[in-house]
Amino acid sequence: MNIIQTFEAEQIARLVSERPVPEFVPGDTLRVLVKVVEGERTRTQAFEGVCIARSNRGVNSNFTIRKISYGEGVERVFPLYSPTIAEIQVVRRGDVRRAKLYYLRGRSGKSARIAEKARSTTTETAAAE
């Protein structure tokens, strides 16, 4: 590992210790709580939608969330380790077979729905024990 990769690994470890990042993949519905500064006040704003893409590039990793707001599609790209993100919550797990879900841009209504991933029984029984 060269010095740049070592430095990036240390930075990622530091950032994850400050704010843990949940495991999520494209197709999952996420709620991202973003810190918004208005004058002197700071508040958190929720942005909930389907993760349509994720780019794993070390410290520069990002993910794209798409939601429908008042009939218009809204997409937002979030840097994964950004200090403006207060929290990332996984609302539901989606069952998709693609890494990039850009085809959802051309769909609306029922055709844009994503099936929920069935829960595995092995993890539930292991958690019960």
UniProtKB/Swiss-Prot annotation:
One of its GO terms (molecular function) is structural constituent of ribosome. It comes from the Bacteria. One of its GO terms (biological process) is translation. GO terms for cellular component: cytosolic large ribosomal subunit. Keywords: Ribonucleoprotein, Ribosomal protein. It holds the Pfam family Ribosomal_L19. The keyword Transport does not apply. Gene3D superfamilies: 2.30.30.790. This protein is located at the 30S-50S ribosomal subunit interface and may play a role in the structure and function of the aminoacyl-tRNA binding site. PANTHER family: LARGE RIBOSOMAL SUBUNIT PROTEIN BL19M (PTHR15680:SF9), RIBOSOMAL PROTEIN L19 (PTHR15680). This is Large ribosomal subunit protein bL19. The gene is rplS.
